[in-house]
Amino acid sequence: MLSSLAPYMANPRQTLTQVLNFALVLSTAFMLWKGLSVVTNSTSPIVVVLSGSMEPAFQRGDLLFLWNRSPRVDVGEIVVYNVRGKDIPIVHRVMRSFPELPGREDKKSVKKGGEEGEETSSTPSQKLLTKGDNNMADDTELYAQGQEYLDRKEDIVGSVRGYVPGVGYVTILLSEHPWLRSVLLGFMGLMVVLQRE
């Protein structure tokens, strides 16, 4: 086994260069993702549709591009939101909007320095009710327990501004079959290391 590594050990400078090139590719991809997050003001500027709840507008596996710089969301707009306590993005259409009155205080339970208390905020936040185009009822059953609507500032990841059909199936396959992710990453690493200049 060690004899197969001999060509790489004979020229450690070239091997180190290849490993650093692979690390550079990974760090560049990470920086591009973070840069896109800053530009779009979204924690996930690109998401994949995971279910058929938005058919016929979007199919399972479609890749969506999000934008979260608008201060308000209009009724009929398609948004991506996260349910509190869960890390699964949901793509649905806004059915109703409930604007907060300016000056009304929102009370939020916060924990600072180990002590629990209430924090009040007088900035208005838009409240939204969503529904999948292919669903019979609105999303109140999907929201966190006791939550009747989505908060624009806290729950919305972004509004859909564009999409590419079917490209996200790769992501779905990688999440449904974790071993495939390891094989793909190992193959990419092997290709970089074995590449000769």
Curated annotation (Swiss-Prot):
Query: Where does the secretion signal sit in this chain?
Result: none
The UniProt record lists the keyword Ribonucleoprotein = no
EC numbers on record:
3.4.21.89
Q: Which regions of this chain are Cytoplasmic-facing, per the record's topological domains?
A: 1-14
A GO cellular component entry from the record: signal peptidase complex
Provide the protein's localization.
Endoplasmic reticulum membrane
Q: Which UniProt keywords apply?
A: Endoplasmic reticulum, Glycoprotein, Hydrolase, Membrane, Protease, Signal-anchor, Transmembrane, Transmembrane helix
Residues spanning the membrane = 15-33
Q: Which CDD domains match?
A: S26_SPase_I
From the UniProt entry, list the residue stretches annotated as the region C-terminal short (CTS) helix: 183-194
Where's the active site on this chain?
Answer: 53, 92, 139
Q: In which family does this protein belong, per the annotation? A: Belongs to the peptidase S26B family.
Q: How does it assemble?
A: Component of the signal peptidase complex (SPC) composed of a catalytic subunit SEC11 and three accessory subunits SPC1, SPC2 and SPC3. The complex induces a local thinning of the ER membrane which is used to measure the length of the signal peptide (SP) h-region of protein substrates. This ensures the selectivity of the complex towards h-regions shorter than 18-20 amino acids. SPC associates with the translocon complex.
The record's listing under PANTHER family reads: SIGNAL PEPTIDASE COMPLEX CATALYTIC SUBUNIT SEC11 (PTHR10806:SF6)
Protein name according to UniProt: Signal peptidase complex catalytic subunit SEC11
Q: Which organism is it from?
A: Paracoccidioides lutzii (strain ATCC MYA-826 / Pb01)
